[in-house]
UniProtKB/Swiss-Prot annotation:
It comes from the Bacteria. GO terms for molecular function: rRNA binding; structural constituent of ribosome; tRNA binding. Part of the 50S ribosomal subunit. PANTHER family: 50S/60S RIBOSOMAL PROTEIN L16, LARGE RIBOSOMAL SUBUNIT PROTEIN UL16M. Binds 23S rRNA and is also seen to make contacts with the A and possibly P site tRNAs. CDD domains: Ribosomal_L16_L10e. One of its GO terms (biological process) is translation. GO terms for cellular component: ribonucleoprotein complex; ribosome. InterPro entries: Ribosomal_uL16, Ribosomal_uL16_bact-type, Ribosomal_uL16_CS, Ribosomal_uL16_dom, Ribosomal_uL16_sf. This is Large ribosomal subunit protein uL16.
Amino acid sequence: MLSPKRVKFRKQQRGRMRGVATRGNTIAFGQFALQAQECGWITSRQIEASRRAMTRYVKRGGKIWIRIFPDKPVTMRAAETRMGSGKGNPEFWVAVIKPGRILFEMGGDEITPEIAREAMRLAQYKLPVKTKFISLDEQEQSAGASAPAAAAATVES
């Protein structure tokens, strides 16, 4: 299971999930990726379950990159505990996910779009957030389509 080796503070506040991912929202390593469509918390167990599902499907065919890391501790109180007496102990670790964040990437010579799509579909079932399959070609096309429009807008003003 993924978790930080050491942290400066043992306990964190829960926080709010607003806005979209400004970092980690483009494909950096592979040819195919799984992108989050909504915000949420993904635990280290869910990340590991998704990784296992993908690895078992592609076998030794390609490489899988995990682009998220669970760095937020979630605390819980013992069952049937009275109110007060401080914050609970850290029970598990989560990664905070915002829409647009790339969760997993996949690439390699033997990985076809069909294999990658099926492996990512198996991983999707293990995750608590809505996701979509994207490829490097789709990302470049969407970036290429928006670039001329942005350039035209800057020329006119």
